[in-house]
Design a protein with these regions (language model features):
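Short, amphipathic alpha-helical "recognition" segments used to contact nucleic acids or chromatin
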Residues: 1-15, 64-74
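Key DNA-contact positions within bacterial/archaeal DNA-binding proteins
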Residues: 29-32, 98
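Mobile-element integrase/transposase regions
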Residues: 62, 93-94, 105-160, 168-189, ...
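Short, charged, surface-exposed loops that flank catalytic or proteolytic processing sites
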Residues: 136, 255-270
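RNase H-like two-metal-ion nuclease catalytic core shared by retroviral integrases
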Residues: 192-196, 206-252, 264, 268
């Protein structure tokens, strides 16, 4: 029903105020307010005056152009979320991600993303920090003409990266390095979740179960430290790590290029002094439970555990042979 009809019914005594308001789908208070406007200005009085007023919060052309030029001058090719992070942290921008995305898309600098399908049900995070950590690696062209492995150790409860560094190829040494950095910074944790790479587990049959009795050097070290080792049996099981690497592959090459970094040493310094802390600030979430499952490492020498152990037989001359060398004891 149109307002005029309801107004005439009410003013003619055929409808009560409550009935007229109900027919219009509004409360009595709104109906009374509209009656006052209608009596004063007619139908024009019923129009929402806000529609003809410029919002005080609306960005002006100068601000829009500044964002566009900032993106063009130093961030061309960056995804919107990555640029928005720098826009807020480095340029003290106050606009929302959606606003920045709309501006860049309007300028033809960002693509409109395709609608995503229904998301799968996520695995629940560990409720307490230090209960479960992930360790994984991603092979990628992080700088021009260079393919490295990025090794990340991450807390499942919060997503905090406890260690991340580049190396030529992941393996036993890189696993030890990531574990050593994590334990030195936070302490011993309860369990490690990893893929079934040959440096983590021995797998007698391709695609089969891992051998929990014959341990790799990483497995031996974890057992010695009292850390449970959990094997992932599908890429989907490592989804949290995979999504983190998608973020790193979309951001790190641009950040390293912007900083003029082309060497592994320089890239690792950037990870340690700049990138890891910034990533943790932006992406970490609060754990379900307060407190921590980390405990201090106080027994023995950590480097003596996080290294390869090889058994050798001592000869009659008190020497052992190792990789073609004769070592005197």
């Amino acid at each position: 029903m149109r307002f005029e009809e309801a107004f005439q019914g009410w003013s003619g005594g055929r409808l009560t105020q409550a009935e007229a308001a109900m027919l219009l789908g509004q409360c009595e208070r709104s109906f009374r307010r509209h009656v006052e406007r209608y009596k004063a200005d007619g139908l024009e009085g019923l129009l929402d005056k806000r529609l003809s007023q410029r919002s005080q919060r609306r960005a002006g052309p100068a601000e829009v152009d500044q964002v566009v030029q900032t993106y063009k001058s130093g961030f061309a090719g960056w995804n919107v979320a990555h640029f928005h992070s720098k826009y807020r942290s480095e340029f003290k921008g106050v606009r929302s991600y959606s606003w920045v995305k709309t501006v860049l898309q309007g300028a033809g600098l960002a693509r409109t993303a395709k609608r995503r399908g229904k998301h799968r049900i996520k695995r629940e995070r560990a409720p307490l920090v230090g209960m479960m950590l992930h360790q994984d690696a991603s092979t990628h062209r992080w700088v021009p003409e260079q393919v490295w492995d990025l090794v990340v150790t991450m807390d499942d409860a919060t997503g905090e990266h406890t260690s991340m560094f580049f190396c030529d190829q992941e393996g036993t040494a890189s696993s030890f390095h990531g574990l050593g950095q994590t334990i030195a910074r936070y302490g011993l944790f309860a369990s490690l979740y990893s893929d079934r790479g040959s440096h983590y587990f021995l797998t007698p049959q391709v695609g089969g179960k891992v051998d929990k009795t014959h341990l790799t050097e990483v497995g031996r070290a974890l057992k010695q430290l009292g850390i449970e080792h959990i094997a992932a049996y599908s890429p989907e099981a490592r989804g949290r790590s995979e999504r983190a690497f998608q973020t790193h592959q979309g951001r790190l090459p641009q950040e390293l290029a912007r900083a003029g970094i082309t060497t592994m040493d320089g890239a690792n310094r950037y990870l340690e002094h700049t990138y890891r802390a910034g990533h943790n600030r932006e992406f970490c979430v609060a754990s379900t439970l307060p407190g921590t499952a980390y405990v201090p490492f106080i027994s023995g020498s950590l480097p003596d555990i996080l290294c390869e152990h090889h058994e050798r037989t001592v000869g009659n001359d008190n020497s052992v042979s190792f990789e073609g060398l004769s070592l005197q004891l």
